[in-house]
Amino acid sequence: MAAKDVKFGRDAREGILKGVDTLANAVKVTLGPKGRNVVIEKSFGAPRITKDGVTVAKEIELKDKYENMGAQMLREVASKTNDLAGDGTTTATVLGQAIVREGMKSVAAGMNPMDLKRGIDIAVTKVVENLKSRSKDVAGSEEIAQVGIISANGDREVGEKIAEAMEKVGKEGVITVDESKGLEFELETVEGMQFDRGYLSPYFITNPDKMTVELENPYILIHEKKLSNLQAMLPILEAAVQSGRPLLIIAEDIEGEALATLVVNKLRGGLKVAAVKAPGFGDRRKAMLQDIAILTKGEMISEDLGIKLENVTLGMLGEAKRVTIDKDNTTIVDGAGDEADIKARVNEIRTQIDNTTSDYDREKLQERLAKLAGGVAVIKVGGASEVEVKERKDRVDDALHATRAAVEEGIVPGGGTALLYATKVLEGLKGENDDQTRGIDIVRKAIVAPVRQIATNAGHDGAVISGNLLREDNESQGFNAATDTYEDLVKAGVIDPTKVVRVALQDAASVAGLLITTEAAISEVPEDKSSGGGMPDMGGMGGMGGMGGF
């Protein structure tokens, strides 16, 4: 086991604080509309240029072990905020630094760290309550666009594209961000339910120009197992022919004579039919087939439920307005399912999302939810170079998370003013003792830091700007760093999602509280690798001298 180096008290805290400052100072230059870029060297390829706080934080690794501990703890603040809210990482870092610095000063002055932490927790709870009480619901796509614009550092095109995507697929829909080959932003949307399975045979194609199968007003047979026996299918095929409507078969697989018969019938024109494999695998396949059944008002034909294929009637089949199938995807548009049944299924999936602990399962459940409740939109980000595309993609990701957070918990005035005005609820608030009251004061000072930093990055004196704002009665009034003016920020469209501000403060206070209450730090002593193992260094053997006589 490697030897350890242990530092106590002030020595430990000094190294940690230095690391916190190093990381925070690199991240906070990106805050606000006039924040600067950070250039990150890559081990191969061009350097990366970004204005995304969490990207900067993740790249920082310090040489000194104790400084690195502080930097990594503060990096955790940025990462956690990014995971929970998707934005606000720079704000969280600025808040974390402010709380740690003030807290360390108080500990150095002889105050009890545990009471300081209790005071910090009391203050954070009060501020969060205040933020929630002042939060406003997002009304319309204009406000959604504004949230996106602010989060994308003033890029109007990004905000508008996200608002357009949300309008098309709904608030529950899936919106993904991809890189585009061209220079432009593009938005692609898929209406209805789409799953990644194409036609089983090209002979099913009805539109040779597009190489797609297009079925208008079809019946949909949803079968859980493989279909290879033709006899069992005959009754339902005959019923479909008599109805004169197309038939889509979704099953685990269709093979042998069953597939051959379907193809022959299609080519002869007796039956408009197409077949696709069921999406997903294992239990997830069952769940997705059930989703399709509910969406199309059909029944999933399963031996487990005691339903045999030969006994299936037209009334047990699903229906939809249109189905389009290409070689990779199947899209069901406007299924005949009952609104109430779909809603119940959506709520069931939501409960599963809340209860699952696996990120992978959560992602798959969210995809299912979107397919049932909304749709899927893809925002394709373009640019003149690979570096530019990556930088813009970072901003679009941030903006997308921010708009989702705004829809979830509402909005507050932006530019750090929501936290600035929350200082008023902490005035006169006392803890059980002086040290707890000092903890409350630490938070009161810290939550002014984001406004100051935004003003500083815009070339103004942060202390003067925050002082001017605290004299205001209108809590929507703030400093718009983009235009260098004092104005009503809600009317000007400078708004932040409440969830982002709340999560940033809670995460910053949580990690800062741990650092303030740290009394010892342990790091590994690097092994001395100057000389290898085995024989000791012989320092050279010298010359052998003349041998003479020969």
Curated annotation (Swiss-Prot):
Belongs to the chaperonin (HSP60) family. The keyword Cytoplasm applies. It comes from Erythrobacter litoralis (strain HTCC2594). PROSITE patterns: CHAPERONINS_CPN60 (PS00296). The lineage of its organism: Bacteria, Pseudomonadati, Pseudomonadota, Alphaproteobacteria, Sphingomonadales. One of its GO terms (cellular component) is cytoplasm. Transmembrane segments: none annotated. SUPFAM superfamilies: GroEL apical domain-like (SSF52029), GroEL equatorial domain-like (SSF48592), GroEL-intermediate domain like (SSF54849). Keywords: ATP-binding, Chaperone, Cytoplasm, Isomerase, Nucleotide-binding. Together with its co-chaperonin GroES, plays an essential role in assisting protein folding. The GroEL-GroES system forms a nano-cage that allows encapsulation of the non-native substrate proteins and provides a physical environment optimized to promote and accelerate protein folding. It is found in: Cytoplasm. The keyword Cytoplasm applies. Gene3D superfamilies: GroEL (3.50.7.10), GroEL-like equatorial domain (1.10.560.10), TCP-1-like chaperonin intermediate domain (3.30.260.10). GO terms for molecular function: ATP binding; ATP-dependent protein folding chaperone; isomerase activity; unfolded protein binding. The gene is groEL2. ATP binds at residues 30-33, 51, 87-91, 415, 480-482, 496. Its EC number is 5.6.1.7. InterPro entries: Chaperonin_Cpn60_CS, Cpn60/GroEL, Cpn60/GroEL/TCP-1, GroEL-like_apical_dom_sf, GROEL-like_equatorial_sf, TCP-1-like_intermed_sf. Forms a cylinder of 14 subunits composed of two heptameric rings stacked back-to-back. Interacts with the co-chaperonin GroES. GO terms for biological process: protein refolding. It catalyses: ATP + H2O + a folded polypeptide = ADP + phosphate + an unfolded polypeptide. This is Chaperonin GroEL 2.
